[in-house]
Amino acid sequence: IPDSIFEIAQGAFAESPKLTVLTVSENNRWYVSIDNVLYDAEKTTLLAFAGGNALSEFTVPNTVTLLGRQAFAGAVNLRCVTLGATIKDYGTGTFSSCSALESVILEDETLRVIPEDFFNGCISLHDFSMPPAVERIGARAFQLCSALESITLPRTLTELGDNAFGKCQKLKEIAVPDSVKTMGESVFTGCDHMQSASLPKSMTVLPADTFSFCYALH
């Protein structure tokens, strides 16, 4: 990235799995790259993790308060990420299509929103502890997390977006807490191995395709 660039839009390098090197000119006043990870000059925003970066484990620096849209999207070698409590804002699709990602440690227990497409397509993700204060899970947040076997939804949760857990093929059971007031369509569609599910007692409408193609549900 030359020194003339003063604005890089979020998602500019998303889904680029063969991008192994991401460097910034030393004379650029607005951006910096460390280990092929792109930040703003103050290192408060992480904009892009090179899709072909060889790192398999990564801890986001504690200076970072914002993860840009699709910041890690398509990072094919990444297996484990630690997200510190300093991060207060997440863009959509943060980890979409991180096919090798197995676990994410999220240290901020006050996080209220899991954004849209947060883990969409993370086919190896099997370990994620939902923060206890989460109120909304965005559309497709866990879609195609086909290795995820269990997830506990907190009692603070009020909204589940469309296809939030669509095609989580190994998810065996789910308990939607009574706090949930809004559910989108196809929330659990294609969860092949789901055997049991419980819904809020106050629920009056079951949205379209909520449990469609859940062949093991009984």
Enumerate the predicted regions with their spans.
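Structural signature of tandem-repeat unit edges
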Residues: 1-7, 16-44, 49-66, 75-89, ...
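Consensus positions within tandem repeat domains that build extended binding/scaffold surfaces
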Residues: 10-12, 47-48, 68-71, 91-94, ...
